[in-house]
Amino acid sequence: MRLAVLVPVVVCSLALVGTAGASQLIARNASNISLQVNSNGKALITYRAGRRVTHLIAWGAINARPRPASPSGPRQVKLKLDYSGGWGPWRKLIWKHFKNACQPYDGPELAWFVTACRAPNGSYWALQSWQTALPDLGFVPWMKKQRTWWLHLSHWSGPLPQLEVYQDWVYSGRFQRIFGRYTYKGRGVRGFGTTHFGAPTDSYGRLVFVDTHNSVYGAGWMRENSFVSSGPPGLFCYGFYPFDPLVNGYAHPPGTTHRKRGPGTGDMYRLTATGPGVTPDVSWQGPGLHPYDPNNPSDVEHEHEMNAKLTEIKAGWHKCHAG
């Protein structure tokens, strides 16, 4: 779903440390990747990471649970993973005699696509890979782990999660902002809490990552920030402001000073959200806004329209105010 609309929204962003599990992280910097699924609902993922070839067996989860009423409820679904090719749980290397029954993929288009197929029962398995751990605020990665490409595995049937995105200006047009909602089967994707710096603390919380293109950070795509969707609507809002890299837990290279970075406004933005449960990661991409002109009737009208859209999305939720 691609929407590029404007509306005054309040910024409720936090620097985030770490990432939440989703789809499901199975490897880093993998190559020579293949996916097979048998008639018993088990997937075999073969890949090379460094000098090692791994035959991973995955099974036991599909889609995502709705968030329960309290944190004491059941945990979010999670695939079982055996990196020994079957020896661990079954005491035999089932990968050597694995009978693939998966058919060519005919499901919805996926972001960060590597490979996918349709299982005999009609469900889908997919692999996606993207640089999940890039540092925020447009820093060029200075550690190897920040440059890694994470390989995510998903298993689902039915609709994908939906990432609905709008744009507006805030503080009398001085800054740009992105807002919207992240939903799955009509319900907001949300957890029960975050750390002081905004990282999810439970298996239901999910992160939305924002990349900016051709910004003050440099040419091409750079990681701007990440945040959780919250509340019954699965609401999120993020303002492109200058940020002090030494405040709020941002990772930063040695020698970084308190000099603010940004605003990270660009000519395009890309949002990627990790899928709830073991559903696929989803992404949105669209052009950024031009500088706000209070004398331009079109800009003023867009602000009013987006104010109304934000109020509609919030549905009484207390975060993200028009501004």
Region roles according to the model:
Residues 17-19:
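N-terminal signal peptide c-region/cleavage motif recognized by signal peptidases
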Residues 4-15:
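Bacterial N-terminal signal peptides
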Residues 21-323:
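Extracellular, repeat-based ectodomains that mediate carbohydrate processing or recognition
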